């Protein structure tokens, strides 16, 4: 669509100059004129995130990421990369401030946009654990595990859950959760903890 190309060209100059407010205004008009222009959508999402409106950007990135037409494959990859980039940047800032409630609120923002957001569920769970809200971890972990599409990520969730049970001295539940850690970097630690918990339980019962 010729008009969309014109909007891309107009918005490109302020975007490259990091004048995201002006670029967003132009790209928003272009996206409204051509809602199937995923390249424009990605630029608009970036502008919103750079302006501090992460949720608005996330809505757009999720819209792009949901496209299954092969012609949008490159745009889908870029949208997913943008979600990861801006999520990690925001989390790093909040972690640096030890603002666990801020991280939880941020994850809730992401879940408001997409309740099946596996990354948001995991971020939220980790923040609950870091603030020592073990009851919150226990209440949320199964839901978080259910939306993970990767076995390694699911194992990470069960590792956090097992650690929460262990912190509350709920040994059988801790063993059960840690036994579900079957992939990723926490397998050895989970197995070691399970062995230790079983040994301690055996000593207590002898």
Where are these regions (language model features)?
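Start-of-helix register in tetratricopeptide repeats
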Residues: 5, 39, 78, 85, ...
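Short coil turns that delineate tetratricopeptide repeat
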Residues: 1, 35, 69, 115, ...
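Register position in tetratricopeptide repeats
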Residues: 9, 16-17, 50-51, 85, ...
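Canonical positions in the second alpha-helix
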Residues: 29-30, 63-64, 109-110, 143-147, ...
């Amino acid at each position: 669509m010729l008009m969309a190309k014109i909007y891309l060209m107009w918005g490109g100059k302020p975007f490259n100059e990091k004048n995201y407010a002006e670029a967003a205004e132009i790209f928003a008009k272009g996206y409204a004129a051509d809602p199937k222009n995923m390249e424009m959508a990605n630029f608009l999402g970036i502008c919103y995130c750079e302006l501090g409106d992460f949720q608005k950007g996330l809505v757009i990135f999720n819209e792009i990421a949901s496209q299954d037409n092969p012609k949008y494959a490159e745009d889908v990859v870029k949208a997913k990369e943008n979600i990861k980039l801006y999520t990690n940047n925001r989390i790093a800032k909040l972690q640096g401030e030890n603002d666990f409630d801020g991280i939880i609120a941020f994850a809730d923002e992401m879940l408001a946009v997409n309740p099946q957001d596996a990354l948001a569920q995991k971020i939220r769970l980790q923040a609950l654990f870091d603030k020592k809200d073990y009851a919150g971890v226990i209440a949320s972990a199964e839901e978080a595990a259910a939306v993970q599409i990767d076995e390694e990520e699911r194992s990470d969730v069960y590792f956090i859950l097992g650690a929460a049970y262990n912190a509350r001295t709920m040994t059988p539940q801790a063993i059960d959760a840690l036994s579900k850690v079957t992939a990723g970097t926490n397998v050895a630690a989970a197995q070691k903890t399970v062995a230790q918990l079983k040994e301690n339980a055996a000593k207590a019962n002898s």
